[in-house]
Amino acid sequence: MRTLVILAAILLVALQAQAEPLQARTDEATAAQEQIPTDNPEVVVSLAWDESLAPKDSVPGLRKNMACYCRIPACLAGERRYGTCFYLGRVWAFCC
């Protein structure tokens, strides 16, 4: 029984030791994203669009009035994913 308790304690210490560097990396990534230069007004956004998923013209004017957004991690309720956005080195869902 003592052996089991000692092994469990060692496991918990090992997991905690691994969690701290992970949290540090997450903090560094967040800090890097917050340091977006404001002096460069040019932003590059790359979109990948799948035409087979495009809404059909069964409802006139649907495409003209459709609003699309790049979202993480997924589309909101009522939206549909039509492709992928690549922005700031991350992959976003292209939702309409």
From Swiss-Prot:
Keywords: Antibiotic, Antimicrobial, Defensin, Disulfide bond, Fungicide, Phosphoprotein, Secreted, Signal
Designated name of the protein: Neutrophil defensin 1
Cysteine pairs bridged by disulfides in the record: 68-96, 70-85, 75-95
Higher taxonomy: Eukaryota, Metazoa, Chordata, Craniata, Vertebrata
Family: Belongs to the alpha-defensin family.
Record's subunit section: Tetramer. Dimer. Interacts with RETN.
Coiled-coil zones: none
Gene Ontology cellular-component annotations: extracellular space
Sequence positions bearing Phosphotyrosine: 87
Post-translational modification: ADP-ribosylation drastically reduces cytotoxic and antibacterial activities, and enhances IL8 production.
Region forming the signal peptide: 1-19
Propeptide: 20-66
Gene source species: Macaca mulatta
Role of this protein: Effector molecule of the innate immune system that acts via antibiotic-like properties against a broad array of infectious agents including bacteria, fungi, and viruses or by promoting the activation and maturation of some APCs. Interacts with the essential precursor of cell wall synthesis lipid II to inhibit bacterial cell wall synthesis. Inhibits adenovirus infection via inhibition of viral disassembly at the vertex region, thereby restricting the release of internal capsid protein pVI, which is required for endosomal membrane penetration during cell entry.
Compartment(s) of residence: Secreted
Keyword Phosphoprotein: yes
GO biological process: antibacterial humoral response; antimicrobial humoral immune response mediated by antimicrobial peptide; cellular response to lipopolysaccharide; defense response to fungus; defense response to Gram-negative bacterium; defense response to Gram-positive bacterium; disruption of plasma membrane integrity in another organism; innate immune response in mucosa
